[in-house]
C-alpha cells in the first residue's frame, strides 16, 4: 500500500460503539497518541472487536467517551461547568492510557475559571402527620425554599401565584408555602412543580436528607431536605 492509500484510510470515517453509544471519527484522531490503547488498537497492535453492525466495539462508559474523543481531536480538556464525574473520567483516561489526558485530570490547577462560584438552593418539606388518621392525611405542611439567588425567589413568587391560598410567605432569602389541614397530594404536586422550576434554572440535586421526629403522642413529624447547586460567574460589584 503506498502513502497515498494510507493517507486516505487514515482520514476515512470510523464508527465506534462505546458502551452502546455510537461515535464517528477518523483513524488519524484515534491514533493521535500511538502509545495509547486506542493508538495500539487502531494501529494494528491490539485485537479489536465489532458489534453486529460491524462497528468497532469498546465495552466502556459511552457518555464519557465524548470527552476522551474531544481531547484526541484538540489536545485540550473541555468540560461543562457543572461536570461532577472526575473520578469516572480519570478511570476512562487510565483505561485508554492517554498520558496527556491523565496529566490534565491530575493537574492541581482548577479545571474551572477562577471567576466562578457555586449557588445553592435548599428545599425543605416539613409534614406533621396524624398517627390515628389515614396515612396520607396531613395536619400541616410547610414547604420552604432558601437561597441567596433573589431572581429565583422572585420567579417562584411570581410563577406560583395560584398557591397563594396556601399562605405563601416571602422573606429575605426564603419563600415558604404553608398548607393545613390538607391532603398529602397537594403538597406533592407543589413540590414536584418547584423541583422542575428549580432544575430548569440550571440547578442539579446535590443531596437529599430525611429526618423523622415525634413531637406529640398523636403526631409524627417528617422532614425532607433537598440541596440544589449550580455554578455561576462572579460579577464585579
UniProtKB/Swiss-Prot annotation:
Q: Where are the transmembrane segments?
A: none
Keyword annotations for this protein, in alphabetical order, are: Cytoplasm, Growth regulation, Tumor suppressor, Ubl conjugation pathway
Where's it found, cell-wise? Cytoplasm, Myofibril, Sarcomere, M line
Q: Name one GO biological process term.
A: negative regulation of smoothened signaling pathway
Q: Respond yes or no to whether keyword Thylakoid is given for this record.
A: no
Please list which residues make up the signal peptide: none
Q: Which GO terms describe its molecular function?
A: ankyrin binding; cullin family protein binding; identical protein binding
Using the UniProt annotation, give all residue ranges assigned to the region (Interaction with ANK1 isoform Mu7): 1-104
What's a GO cellular component annotated to this UniProt protein?
A: M band
Q: In which pathway does it act?
A: Protein modification; protein ubiquitination
The residue ranges of the BTB domain are 12-81
Keyword Cytoplasm attributed? yes
User: Entry's Pfam families?
Assistant: BTB_2
Region annotation Interaction with USP21: where it falls in the sequence? 113-187
The segments labelled Interaction with CUL3 in the record are 10-110
Q: In which tissues is it expressed?
A: Highly expressed in cerebellum and brain.
What the entry lists under InterPro entries is as follows:
BTB/POZ_dom, SKP1/BTB/POZ_sf, T1-type_BTB
Chief place where the protein resides: cytoplasm
Its assembly, as annotated, is:
Homopentamer. Interacts with KCTD11; KCTD6 and KCTD11 may associate in heteropentameric assemblies. Interacts (via BTB domain) with CUL3; initially a 4:4 stoichiometry has been reported, however, electron microscopy revealed pentameric states with a five-pointed pinwheel shape. The interaction with CUL3 is indicative for a participation in a BCR (BTB-CUL3-RBX1) E3 ubiquitin-protein ligase complex. Interacts with HDAC1; probably indirect as the interaction requires the presence of KCTD11. Interacts with USP21 (preferentially catalytic inactive form).
Q: What does this protein do?
A: Probable substrate-specific adapter of a BCR (BTB-CUL3-RBX1) E3 ubiquitin-protein ligase complex mediating the ubiquitination and subsequent proteasomal degradation of target proteins. Promotes the ubiquitination of HDAC1; the function seems to depend on KCTD11:KCTD6 oligomerization. Can function as antagonist of the Hedgehog pathway by affecting the nuclear transfer of transcription factor GLI1; the function probably occurs via HDAC1 down-regulation, keeping GLI1 acetylated and inactive. Inhibits cell growth and tumorigenicity of medulloblastoma (MDB).
- Name of the protein in its database record: BTB/POZ domain-containing protein KCTD6
The species is: Mus musculus
Give me the gene this protein comes from.
Kctd6
Amino acid at each position: 500500500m503506498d502513502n497515498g492509500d494510507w493517507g486516505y484510510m487514515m482520514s476515512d470515517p470510523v464508527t465506534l460503539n462505546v458502551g452502546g453509544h455510537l461515535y464517528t471519527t477518523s483513524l488519524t484522531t484515534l491514533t493521535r497518541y500511538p502509545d495509547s490503547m486506542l493508538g495500539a488498537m487502531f494501529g494494528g497492535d491490539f485485537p479489536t472487536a465489532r458489534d453486529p453492525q460491524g462497528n468497532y466495539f469498546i465495552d466502556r462508559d459511552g457518555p464519557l467517551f465524548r470527552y476522551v474523543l474531544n481531547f484526541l481531536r484538540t489536545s485540550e480538556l473541555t468540560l461543562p461547568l457543572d461536570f461532577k464525574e472526575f473520578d469516572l473520567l480519570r478511570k476512562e483516561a487510565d483505561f485508554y492510557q492517554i498520558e496527556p489526558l491523565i496529566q490534565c485530570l491530575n493537574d492541581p490547577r482548577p479545571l474551572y475559571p477562577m471567576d466562578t462560584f457555586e449557588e445553592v438552593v435548599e428545599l425543605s418539606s416539613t409534614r406533621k402527620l396524624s398517627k390515628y388518621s389515614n396515612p396520607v392525611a396531613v395536619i400541616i405542611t410547610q414547604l420552604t425554599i432558601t437561597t441567596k439567588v433573589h431572581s429565583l425567589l422572585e420567579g417562584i413568587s411570581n410563577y406560583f401565584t395560584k398557591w397563594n391560598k396556601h399562605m405563601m410567605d416571602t422573606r429575605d432569602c426564603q419563600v415558604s408555602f404553608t398548607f393545613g389541614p390538607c391532603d398529602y397530594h397537594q403538597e406533592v404536586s407543589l413540590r414536584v412543580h418547584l423541583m422542575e422550576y428549580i432544575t430548569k434554572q440550571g440547578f442539579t440535586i446535590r443531596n437529599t436528607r430525611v429526618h423523622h421526629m415525634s413531637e406529640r403522642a398523636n403526631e409524627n413529624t417528617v422532614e425532607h431536605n433537598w440541596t440544589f447547586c449550580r455554578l455561576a460567574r462572579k460579577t464585579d460589584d
